[in-house]
Amino acid sequence: MSSQSSILVDFRPLATSFTGKYGSIQYCVRAVLERPQVPDQSVRRELQVVSHVDVNTPPLLTPMLKTQEKMVGCWLFTSGPVSLSVKIERKGYCNGEAIPIYAEIENCSSRLVVPKAAIFQTQTYLASGKTKTVRHMVANVRGNHIGSGSTDTWNGKMLKIPPVTPSILDCCIIRVYIHIPGAKKLMLELPLVIGTIPYSGFGRRNSSMASQFSMDMCWLALALPEQPEAPPNYADVVSEEEFSRHIPPYPQPSACDGEACYSMFACIQEFRFQPPPLYSESHAQLFCLQPVGPTNRAHF
């Protein structure tokens, strides 16, 4: 015998399922079959809950930047300062993404230093008024040695995020530090959120598409015909002497109706060798051809 039933789940924000060294976050469904005079029977099934973290929200798109300087040595035995400036493009990333790190390191001390960057995951357990914190490294990258009086620049040095649990209350950080032999490390920490909804780059893609569209439309301006220029004046091109020299003799017609024929011939002679009219956009006229005779019109 089998039956189906449903329950109403409260979809308020829930923390992502997690299992750690000193505690865990688990969700389960437990069903109990109660019968009179018979022991109850129960079954339990675990539910995997993932609280989605969208890295496209404005707080997680904010760039992170920090700068710090440390004097190497103490008292009268100082050897000079070491400065570090670090920036990442945004605060939120997802599993599998590579974080480009931009850093400037200046070594004004007399010692050899080595810059490093790492991702640390921090787990904090609270129970019975006591707190237990566990921090472990999940990824790291190392730079080149920097000698005394030298500088080094990271122009997007990649630090790839391995498969880790999505952040619960911003529990991850990026730690960039400089190992200085014989002295304490110069360390910077930038907050990092591991999300579940990857970065879409919507705004940047729109701007690139708009620039590409404007570039693609450049050919249209080249293909459009230029504004036509007015033709030159006929008198400037053909002189009066050349004009009279090229007029062929026209004999008088033998058979003509008299005045009508003469007037028509005079009209032809009058306009045959006249220069074309000057072109002017302000006096341009549109000519329409109209049908002669009755037309049929349909009404709908």
Swiss-Prot record:
Q: What is its main location?
A: other
Membrane topology designation: Peripheral membrane protein
Keyword Repeat attached: yes
Which positions does the motif PPxY motif 1 occupy?
231-234
Gene3D superfamilies membership: 2.60.40.640
Q: Name one GO molecular function term.
A: ubiquitin-like ligase-substrate adaptor activity
Q: Which InterPro entries match?
A: Arrestin-like_C, Arrestin-like_N, Arrestin_C-like, Arrestin_domain-protein, Ig_E-set
Instruction: List locations, semicolon-separated.
Output: Early endosome; Cell membrane; Cytoplasmic vesicle
Q: Where is this motif: PPxY motif 2?
A: 276-279
Write down a Pfam family by its short name: Arrestin_C
Q: Name one GO cellular component term.
A: extracellular vesicle
Task: Report the domain of life of the source organism.
Answer: Eukaryota
Which UniProt keywords are listed? Cell membrane, Cytoplasmic vesicle, Endosome, Membrane, Repeat
Question: SUPFAM superfamilies from the xrefs?
Answer: E set domains
Q: GO terms for biological process?
A: extracellular vesicle biogenesis; positive regulation of interferon-beta production; protein K63-linked ubiquitination; protein transport; protein ubiquitination
* Subunit relationships: Interacts with ADRB2. Interacts (via PPxY motifs) with ITCH, NEDD4L and WWP2. Interacts with AVPR2. Identified in a complex containing at least ARRDC4, AVPR2 and HGS. Interacts with SLC11A2; controls the incorporation of SLC11A2 into extracellular vesicles through an ubiquitination-dependent mechanism. Interacts with TRIM65.
| Purpose | Functions as an adapter recruiting ubiquitin-protein ligases to their specific substrates. Plays a role in endocytosis of activated G protein-coupled receptors (GPCRs) Through an ubiquitination-dependent mechanism also plays a role in the incorporation of SLC11A2 into extracellular vesicles. May play a role in glucose uptake. Participates in innate immune response by promoting IFIH1/MDA5 activation through interaction with TRIM65.
Q: Which family does it belong to?
A: Belongs to the arrestin family.
What PANTHER family has UniProt attached to this entry? ARRESTIN DOMAIN CONTAINING PROTEIN, ARRESTIN DOMAIN-CONTAINING PROTEIN 4
Q: What is this protein called?
A: Arrestin domain-containing protein 4
Give the organism the record lists. Answer: Rattus norvegicus (Rat)
